[in-house]
Curated annotation (Swiss-Prot):
The keyword Lyase applies. It is an enzyme of class 4 (lyase). SUPFAM superfamilies: Ribulose-phoshate binding barrel. Its EC number is 4.1.1.23. It catalyses: orotidine 5'-phosphate + H(+) = UMP + CO2. This is Orotidine 5'-phosphate decarboxylase. GO terms for cellular component: cytosol. GO terms for molecular function: orotidine-5'-phosphate decarboxylase activity. Belongs to the OMP decarboxylase family. Type 1 subfamily. It comes from the Bacteria. InterPro entries: Aldolase_TIM, OMPdecase, OMPdecase_AS, OMPdecase_bac, OMPdeCOase_dom, RibuloseP-bd_barrel. Pathway: Pyrimidine metabolism; UMP biosynthesis via de novo pathway; UMP from orotate: step 2/2. Catalyzes the decarboxylation of orotidine 5'-monophosphate (OMP) to uridine 5'-monophosphate (UMP).
Length: 243
């Protein structure tokens, strides 16, 4: 299903439930008034199991399942079929898995959703993780290609394979949006409010800047989840997007 840019700031923000125990994640999701989207990552999924997706959906939340599948085509297809059957509406796969695996994953996800009566999901290709810096990418992985051209190439590979969007740093959003107009989705982590700590993200940007650059939705974790008042922090992000 095509994921179109929403004018509602609450729909533009996906809150990452990283670092939370299952009961904390479920309680937090109820606590933040106006919350529409949450991200379930590896840590929470491994601890809570697939049922956490159903539990969050019972709270009328939409789920971004960020497990970054990267395997042979048959395995990726099976995983994406199961993920879509759970009701996850955004599902991540690694673009580096290649076109055959991406094609298989896309087809299987649609089959899984349809057979289970769930919403049609949007698969998102992971290009270059926002924790990478160019020099370290070259030093540790022997990749001489710069981050920007590598992201561009992987996004093009994904779009050609029928994937509905990609995860990218906000710093790559403008260039990718110029190459891939909507409904191709651009989901950007690495979002920080002014004055907030950067943490382990190397390529960050403010919410309004990222949306202006072409992002469809923003993934925001610690600036909201670790705030003294998460609801106030969420509302502050929404206000920034309205300006």
């Amino acid at each position: 299903m095509a994921l179109l840019h929403s004018a509602n700031p609450a729909d533009q923000i996906i809150v990452a439930l990283d670092g939370m125990a299952p009961d904390q994640a479920l309680a937090f999701s109820v606590q933040v008034e106006g919350l529409r989207w949450v991200k379930v990552g590896l840590e929470l999924f491994v601890q809570a199991g697939p049922e956490v997706v159903a539990q969050l959906r019972e709270q009328d939340l939409r789920v971004f399942l960020d497990l970054k599948f990267h395997d042979i085509p048959a395995t990726m297809a099976g995983a994406c079929r199961r993920a879509a059957a759970l009701g996850a509406e955004l599902i991540t796969v690694h673009a580096c898995a290649g076109s055959e695996a991406l094609n298989a994953a896309q087809s299987a996800a649609m089959e899984g959703a349809q057979s289970s009566g769930q919403p049609s999901p949007t698969l998102l290709a992971v290009t270059v993780l926002t924790s990478w810096e160019e020099q370290r990418l070259q030093r540790e992985l022997a990749i001489s290609q710069g981050i920007a051209p590598r992201v561009s190439a992987l996004a093009q590979l994904s779009a050609t394979a029928g994937i509905g969007g990609c995860v990218c740093s906000p710093w790559e959003a403008a260039a990718l949006r110029a190459q891939h107009p909507e409904p191709f989705a651009l989901i950007t982590p690495g979002i920080r409010l002014k004055g907030a700590a950067v943490g382990d993200q190397a390529r960050v940007m403010g919410p309004a800047e990222a949306m202006t650059a072409g992002a469809t939705q923003l993934v925001i974790g610690r600036p909201i989840t670790r705030a003294n008042d998460p609801s106030a922090a969420f509302n502050a992000c929404c206000r920034e997007l309205r300006t």
